[in-house]
Amino acid sequence: MRAFLKYFVVSTILCLVPGVALADNNPPPNTCTAVSFPAPQGGTLAATLCMPSTPTSTIMVLMAGSNYNHTYWDFPYAPETYNFRRAMNAAGYATLVVDRLGTGASTRPPSATLTATGSVLALHQIVGAVRQGLPGAQPFAKIITGGHSLSSGVAVIEASTHHDVDGVLLTGFSHSLDTAGTLAVVATYHSAAEDPQFAGQGLDAGYLTTKPGTRAADFYGAGDYDPGVLATDEATKEVFSLTEYPDGLTSTQPPETNLIDVPVLIVDGSADKLCLNACASTATLAAEEAPYFCPAARLRTFVLPGSGHSVNLARNTAAYQAAVRDWLAAMF
């Protein structure tokens, strides 16, 4: 860990980002710092640390899934509604939003070298660094990892293997995979090198992305999106590699989630085409998922009505943000 921290790099430039008010329309600004970590496989992982306006000992380490980068958690369009990071900062929690290797501002290695196992190791090392204290921030006593889809699988494996976090937020995750819906999404993938958005970037053929104009059907409930959100989502779409999927999917195989011994919140959309029957309601999801978790997980669930796979970007995402705040307040 000392070697890891030795190479930890933090930028010297701080950016002030307006917070999202819960009651005050002009809250103090949040302080955000660009940071980077060495990736276990080589290269660097880019991240942004944001502190709330009041002192806190709790931090959420957030990583996006495939098809997304940091913008999923730190959404630039109508941030007062859709920016999850800002909502958590406004609630008094620190956040560290991390780009997976191969995405965002992180290093892009050959696509075949990307795996969920590599992301698990990276997340584990980041958690250790956060626990000891990042430059410009005190050590955090409580660390909650948060994932979406693929990175929820990463968070599961990290927590069940290393037992070094205090809570786990899983979104776009369940043990009820809709095979037909999943295959329909996969059918919209194509080589990023063939996509106008990534042409000329020198990406190898293994890097994939969604075909233009397919994200509404893939990740949203029918009509459950602001046109500006969808346009921003298409404009900020990300690449990924199918080599990240096989070991990522082991997170849904017994006994993986049963080994998590800290509080867990699962959030899904009722119209998520990747989820079969479990996502019909909060109660249904709780009943379906309960056998896969031990009592120490104190499992909570929340289903966002009408939302597709990307709950951060649904019209009613504020209800999901409120559910997360309630869970954090109750458990930590």
Residue spans for each PLM region:
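N-terminal cap/lid segment of alpha/beta-hydrolase-fold proteins
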Residues: 25-55
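Catalytic active-site module of serine/aspartate enzymes centered on a nucleophile-bearing elbow/loop
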Residues: 297-332
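Alpha/beta-hydrolase active-site loop
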Residues: 113-136
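Conserved hydrolase catalytic core segment
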Residues: 141-177
